[in-house]
Amino acid sequence: NALNTISCVCRENPDRARELILTLSSYYRQALENDQYMLSLHTELYHVASYLELEQARFEEKLVVELDVEDDLNCKVPSFILQPLVENAVRHGGDRTGARHVSISVHSVEGMAEISVADRGQGIPREVVLGLYTGQGKGVGLSNVHKRLKSIYGEDNGLKIETSEAGSRVWFRIPLEPEEIPVPSHEIKQEESYNEDSCD
């Protein structure tokens, strides 16, 4: 989609197309270079901003984005945990006219960082929400984020979803300034398996 958008822009606005090529290059560079499983919140938001700039060129005035981030909020987030939620809101959060309004909010709540993505679309289908919580969902993006959050922070700390015909809000909470960054449970199991094999 990004390349198709840039191709269309090339004909009408070559200078803008060059800017988008640089943005796309930056987007992929971040994806390749950020091999850590935890990133700073600001690094994660920068990656999301690159993605949104490309989508803005595609949807133009039909895409409105609001960003509300509490000042001096310091925390680590799982790498690329936010982008799938934003992408889902952009792709599926259009209203009946095709307009898309996406709100990204990050605030401290009860000693945690609450990160949410909201849209004004027509709601997430009930079967998608049920599938997410039962582990039988077909949606890859939300399901992967839900599983990653539970793997890192525990079974009770996955995605939360509020949805209606007036829009949806998907959110999660993570610790502020953790003294020790948690290791995903699947990585712990892999390390234990390796240690057991090395003792034989």
Feature roles, as predicted:
Residues 1-162, 166-171:
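Two-component histidine phosphotransfer core
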Residues 163-200:
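C-terminal end segment of the histidine kinase catalytic
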